[in-house]
């Protein structure tokens, strides 16, 4: 996979990812569940660029070189000590991470089917491949932008960031507003990412809830944030007792692992209707709240609050987390809509870490198979549905009583 005409010294000189902590917290929270409950699971992930007309092929060798160096990384003693200090991380998991590295044999990078496309597939044990997604996407982004935007307008980026922060800082009615940075995978560069976090910490005070990036949380002394991602619920389609019960199974295993900690449930793997059918009184009272990641956030929030009331759970004690393509103005609208009715929190990604005046890439890497079986996400936004088996997708829709695509 490595480009043979570039020396190892040159590889190290251009490394984008220099720490295995340079990823999102929810990867570690899910990975711990995998270690304890599904250590033998085999999975496949596939990369997709949703932005039309992007030509990444000229940069294939650079991407391969960066991924090669990623696979040489190990956790340092300082990093392991930091993880050990997180209340929900168990000692045997940290011991495992002390032996961990990303297996280069499990990632395949080549040309895609369409002009300019590249293909990235990860295939292997879930426990050993789960940490590929975030750094690989960050690599693709940074390689692309350092070649196509050689002179970034940093001052424009800083101006945009300050104007966003001012929307909150200048409004006394937003005293309880909390926002987190969620932008690792689509960041313009790691240097810009770090500036965003350090600036928000310095200027936003209590309004800055933290970051999903574990390395930056450690460096800057802010809270690392995250619970579960789509891949966890998708994998449970293949790991649970039967497909119809897979969402309940996933939530029950999560509760068994964390015993009430990390209590934000993800709602959109099967759409909101299916989520509410499964999120019964037990889960309403057990979990701290839920995360919105597709569909109309205002409708979603109102439905969830009504569902809590119907299940005798006080919405004012619950947290609604919004993270779907958020901007500061939209987050502020949502904060006003639900003020005094529940707790709200916001995770803003691309609009923070890749807003320097050009179009960011819309790239994803999603799980498509687990234990040889197709898996799928059928969200409240049709364009986010990703599955390589139409027959399975149709069956999934039937089982969860979802409308046809």
From Swiss-Prot:
Pfam families (UniProt xref): NAPRTase, NAPRTase_N
Gene behind this protein: pncB
InterPro entries from the UniProt entry: N/Namide_PRibTrfase (IPR041525), NAPRTase_N (IPR040727), Nic_PRibTrfase (IPR006406), Nic_PRibTrfase-Fam (IPR007229), Nicotinate_pribotase-like_C (IPR036068)
Recorded metabolic or biological pathway in which this protein acts: Cofactor biosynthesis; NAD(+) biosynthesis; nicotinate D-ribonucleotide from nicotinate: step 1/1
GO annotation, biological process: NAD biosynthetic process via the salvage pathway
Name the record gives this protein: Nicotinate phosphoribosyltransferase
Post-translational modification comment from the UniProt entry: Transiently phosphorylated on a His residue during the reaction cycle. Phosphorylation strongly increases the affinity for substrates and increases the rate of nicotinate D-ribonucleotide production. Dephosphorylation regenerates the low-affinity form of the enzyme, leading to product release.
CDD domains from the UniProt entry: PncB_like
Entry's family note: Belongs to the NAPRTase family.
Organism: Bordetella parapertussis (strain 12822 / ATCC BAA-587 / NCTC 13253)
Enzyme Commission code(s) on record: 6.3.4.21
Modified sites of kind Phosphohistidine: 230
Keywords tagged on the record: Ligase, Phosphoprotein, Pyridine nucleotide biosynthesis
Entry GO MF terms: nicotinate phosphoribosyltransferase activity
Catalytic reaction list: nicotinate + 5-phospho-alpha-D-ribose 1-diphosphate + ATP + H2O = nicotinate beta-D-ribonucleotide + ADP + phosphate + diphosphate
């Amino acid at each position: 996979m490595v480009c043979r005409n570039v020396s190892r010294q040159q590889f190290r000189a251009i490394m984008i990812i220099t720490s295995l902590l340079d990823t999102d917290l929810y990867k570690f929270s899910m990975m711990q569940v995998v270690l304890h409950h599904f250590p033998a699971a085999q999975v496949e992930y596939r990369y997709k660029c949703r932005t039309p007309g992007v030509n990444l092929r000229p940069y294939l060798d650079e991407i391969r070189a960066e991924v090669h160096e990623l696979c040489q990384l190990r956790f340092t003693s300082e990093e392991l000590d930091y993880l050990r200090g997180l209340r929900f991380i168990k000692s045997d998991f940290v011991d495992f991470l002390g032996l961990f590295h990303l297996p280069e044999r499990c990632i395949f990078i080549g040309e895609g089917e369409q002009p300019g496309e590249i293909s990235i597939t990860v295939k292997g044990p879930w426990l050993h491949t789960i940490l590929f997604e975030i750094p690989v996407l960050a690599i693709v982004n940074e390689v692309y932008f350092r070649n196509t935007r050689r002179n970034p307008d940093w001052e424009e980026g800083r101006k945009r960031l300050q104007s966003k922060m001012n929307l909150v800082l200048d409004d006394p009615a937003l005293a309880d507003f909390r926002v987190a940075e969620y932008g690792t995978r689509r960041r313009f560069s790691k240097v810009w990412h770090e500036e965003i976090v350090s600036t928000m910490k310095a200027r936003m005070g209590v309004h800055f809830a933290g970051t999903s990036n574990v390395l930056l949380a450690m460096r800057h002394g802010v809270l690392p944030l995250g619970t579960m991602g789509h891949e966890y619920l998708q994998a449970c389609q293949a790991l649970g007792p039967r497909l119809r019960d897979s969402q309940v199974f996933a939530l029950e295993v999560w509760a068994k692992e964390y015993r009430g900690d990390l209590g934000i449930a993800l709602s959109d793997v099967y759409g909101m209707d299916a989520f509410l059918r499964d999120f019964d009184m037990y889960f309403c009272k057990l979990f701290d709240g839920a995360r919105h990641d597709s569909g109309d956030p205002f409708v979603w929030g109102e439905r969830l609050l009504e569902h809590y009331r119907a299940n005798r759970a006080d919405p004012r004690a619950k947290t609604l987390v919004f993270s779907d393509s958020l901007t500061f103005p939209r987050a502020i609208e949502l904060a006003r809509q639900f003020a005094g009715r529940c707790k709200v929190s916001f995770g803003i990604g691309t609009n923070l870490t890749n807003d320097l005046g050009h179009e960011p890439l819309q790239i994803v890497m999603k799980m498509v198979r687990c234990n040889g079986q197709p898996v799928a996400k059928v969200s409240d936004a049709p364009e986010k549905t990703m599955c390589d088996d139409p027959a399975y997708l149709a069956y999934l829709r039937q089982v969860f009583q979802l409308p046809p695509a």
